[in-house]
Amino acid sequence: MSTAKKELFSERVKAGSRTYFFDVKEAATGAKYLVINESKKVGESHEHNRIMIFEEDIPSFSEGLQKVVGFIQK
């Protein structure tokens, strides 16, 4: 069975010394998930962080993110 992942959508956001990548992928099983990558320049190298949000968790993740953004923008 193949474990290949298919990229369906990608968005890149530059923010100062950081770059964020929002990638929607599809697993071999057909399940979709969001991968958020952060790349930050640290000295001469780059630091990378990643979080994966699975399709069934998107509604609650989105709700929480909207609340946080609303709080920050007050």
What do these predicted ranges mean?
Residues M1-K74:
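Positively charged, low-complexity terminal tracts
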